[in-house]
């Protein structure tokens, strides 16, 4: 959000470079409606860049997923893996990548820094930092006011798809987007209960999967069944776990299953 407000022209130039590399004449920048200032600014700026259109999007999670973006912006659906966006004539990049492309091409600047958001209810000074790769997350947390006393977990990434960190000395890398500090109350997990077959997770899944089945089969090591049930199509958005009234750790089990099935598929392909 801040990048679009402060580096709009640079992002648009980066998009033009990406369009030229992909040999396309049309580019879209999708922005959710809860960022009206960014939509207004980018729309005004984009008028000077032929072929680039700003598309306001409905606010819903996970709207930022590449398959969801392609469907929302150009109405094309990406088939199940191994299909990728290029199979439907699309390439998806985020504005951070577009800005990095601009700096690499126009300024001959390698990717050695990126914007990282440090936030949390108990933080004294939640901020966005321009951070060099390799910087320990502890330094960013100190710059944001230090680790609060009621810290329960430190999450690398966002609240839905992020992963808990064992310690704060984990370095920033090119894929780091943010650091979330959760207090004790937020970090506390409810005791998991048996699945009640309510199907809320099925309704919440943006990929049309059956998360309760994937989680149960993964917990029992039934890798053949979870592969058949398209576990590799899961985008790990966490919607299933968030909606589960039984507080089952479905995403944890599904990530385990994806890792196992991915290994099985690679071994199978290596034999061909």
Give short role names for the model-derived ranges.
Residues 1-11, 99, 105-194, 198-202, ...:
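Conserved mixed alpha/beta catalytic, RNA-binding, or beta-rich assembly cores of soluble enzyme
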Residues 1-74, 197, 231-232, 236-241, ...:
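Iron-sulfur-cluster electron-transfer modules
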Residues 3-10, 30-34, 89-97, 128-132, ...:
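Catalytic cores of large soluble enzymes that bind and process phosphate-bearing ligands
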Residues 12, 16, 39, 43, ...:
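Predominant activation on well-ordered alpha-helical scaffold segments within soluble catalytic domains
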Residues 23-137, 143-148, 158:
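Hydrophobic alpha-helical positions that pack around
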Residues 30-32, 55-57, 119-121, 132, ...:
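Generic beta-strand/beta-sheet core signal
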Residues 58-60, 160, 184-185, 220:
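Short, solvent-exposed coil/turn elements at secondary-structure transition points
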Residues 176-192, 202, 206-272:
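Ferredoxin-type iron-sulfur electron-transfer modules in oxidoreductases and energy-metabolism complexes
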């Amino acid at each position: 959000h801040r990048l679009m407000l402060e580096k709009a022209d640079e992002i648009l130039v980066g998009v033009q470079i990406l369009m030229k590399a992909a040999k396309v004449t049309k580019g879209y920048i999708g922005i959710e409606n809860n960022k009206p200032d960014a939509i207004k600014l980018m729309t005004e700026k984009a008028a000077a860049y032929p072929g680039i259109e700003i598309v306001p999007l409905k606010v819903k999670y996970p709207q930022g997923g590449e398959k969801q973006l392609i469907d929302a912006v150009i109405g094309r659906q990406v088939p199940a893996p191994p299909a990728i966006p290029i199979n439907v004539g699309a390439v998806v990049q985020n504005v951070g990548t577009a800005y990095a492309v601009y700096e690499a091409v126009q300024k001959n600047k390698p990717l050695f820094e990126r914007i990282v958001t440090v936030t949390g209810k108990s933080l004294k000074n939640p901020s966005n930092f321009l951070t060099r790769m390799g910087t320990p997350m502890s330094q960013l947390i100190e710059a944001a006011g230090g680790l609060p006393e009621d810290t329960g977990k430190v999450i690398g990434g966002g609240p839905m798809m992020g992963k808990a960190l064992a310690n704060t000395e984990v370095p920033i890398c090119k894929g780091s987007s943010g650091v979330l500090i959760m207090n004790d109350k937020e970090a506390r997990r409810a005791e998991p209960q048996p699945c009640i077959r309510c199907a809320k997770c099925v309704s919440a899944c943006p990929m049309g999967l059956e998360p309760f089945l994937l989680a149960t089969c993964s917990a029992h090591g039934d890798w053949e069944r979870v592969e058949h049930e398209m576990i590799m199509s899961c985008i790990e958005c966490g919607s299933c776990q968030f909606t589960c009234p039984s507080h089952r750790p479905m995403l944890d089990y599904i990530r385990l299953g994806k890792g196992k099935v991915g290994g099985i598929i690679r071994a199978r392909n290596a034999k061909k």
